[in-house]
Amino acid sequence: MVNILLVEDNPDDVKITERALKKGKVLNNLYVARDGQEALDFIYNKGEYTDPQKAPKPGLILLDINLPKVNGIDVLKKVKSDEKLRRIPVIMLTVSKRDEDIIRSYDLGVNSYIIKPVEFDKFVETIKNIELYWLLTNISPTE
């Protein structure tokens, strides 16, 4: 079973992602952080997430860019610069089509950059495709 951390402040996008992953082919534990600081607390077991049983190391991070408190770019930078975390696949799942966001994300080591579809069915299909590739097709280091 894989642990997925969804970092998303839009409650509708959280619900759609949860539903798509529940209907998917891979058993997963989905954890949700509603802002960048909460994501960092979860990843580093700080604040309300000091218990690693309640906040296990994610096997995949779905990360929005435009987040309250700490933005997604800064979360990505911290994760990818940490020797113990840098191999965790991080997927930017965002509405931002700005070239500077895309370039900066790849420069910092993002594994994939996906623009969130506006239509419900396409959003669900995108989440299912992420699951199929990153959790079934892709081979990640076991460490």
Which sequence ranges carry the predicted segments?
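Active-site residues of response regulator receiver
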Residues: 64, 94
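The feature encodes the CheY-like receiver
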Residues: 68, 86, 98
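Acidic, metal-coordinating helix/loop segments flanking the phosphotransfer/catalytic sites
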Residues: 32-60
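Conserved acidic carboxylate
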Residues: 8
